[in-house]
């Protein structure tokens, strides 16, 4: 999968979204036996808003909030920061297991205050096994990923890698040593690169982060989609650097 992606990268300048919409379907080419799409999202930048919520749709376009718009998973029970952002959900290949990944972040602590992500696994969409991974703690010997330098592990998503036989998780990394000057002498432009890891079989751990894609400026919110007709993977992401001065 990694080699195929690096052979052909396609950029898509996407607007930032509050959540990650994904049909809870197996990632296969077979016709779907399922009738609805589940949207996992967070609603706003407050601590109450930064919690997992669900919405349901029959067509993938029009959604109705579930649980009267209230959280379905309390962030203070799963996140080190007691808040989450960017939930991404998918149905596993076995058709019975659901996986969800998200950013472990509380935005009122600042946009450069996030050091990790969350892995979750469930068979009923209600009761979740969860693991919060703090990168400086999990990878203490990895250069540049110390708590002083690392400031963002954003918007994780997963995709099954057939060649490796594991789920690949990919996410945006922001580090202070990558920042570059702007016309404002008091401001440096944040710089993000897309990284990836592989998730353990029990969905509780990840391998050491590896570089997936360096756009040459800040690239966030990656989304990898397989095109079965062309038999290729396409990477969409948001350009957070050239198109705008992002002062967070």
For each feature predicted by the language model, list its residue ranges.
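Beta-rich carbohydrate-recognition and catalytic domains
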Residues: 27-153, 159-248
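N-terminal secretory signal peptides that target proteins for export/translocation
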Residues: 1-5
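Hydrophobic helical h-region of N-terminal Sec-dependent signal peptides
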Residues: 10, 14-22
């Amino acid at each position: 999968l990694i080699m195929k992606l690096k052979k052909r990268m396609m950029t898509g300048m996407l607007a930032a979204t509050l959540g990650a919409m994904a049909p809870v379907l197996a990632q296969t080419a077979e016709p779907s036996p399922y009738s609805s799409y589940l949207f996992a999202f967070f609603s706003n930048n407050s601590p109450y808003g930064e919690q997992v919520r669900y919405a349901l749709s029959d067509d993938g376009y029009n959604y109705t909030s579930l649980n009267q718009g209230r959280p379905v998973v309390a962030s203070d029970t799963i996140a080190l920061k007691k808040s989450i952002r960017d939930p991404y959900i998918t149905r596993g290949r076995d058709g019975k297991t659901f996986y969800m990944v998200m950013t472990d972040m509380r935005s009122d602590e600042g946009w450069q205050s996030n050091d990790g992500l969350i892995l979750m696994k469930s068979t009923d969409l209600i009761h979740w096994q969860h693991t919060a991974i703090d990168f400086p703690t999990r990878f203490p010997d990895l250069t540049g990923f110390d708590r002083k330098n690392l400031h963002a592990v954003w918007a994780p998503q997963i995709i099954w890698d057939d060649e490796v036989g594991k789920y690949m998780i990919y996410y945006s990394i922001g580090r202070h040593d990558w920042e570059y000057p702007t016309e404002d002498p008091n401001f440096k432009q944040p710089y993000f690169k897309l990284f990836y890891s592989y998730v353990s079989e029990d969905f509780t751990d990840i391998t050491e982060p590896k570089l997936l894609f360096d756009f040459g400026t800040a690239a966030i919110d990656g989304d990898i989609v397989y095109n079965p007709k062309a038999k290729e993977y396409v990477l969409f992401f948001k350009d957070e650097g050239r198109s705008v001065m992002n002062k967070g």
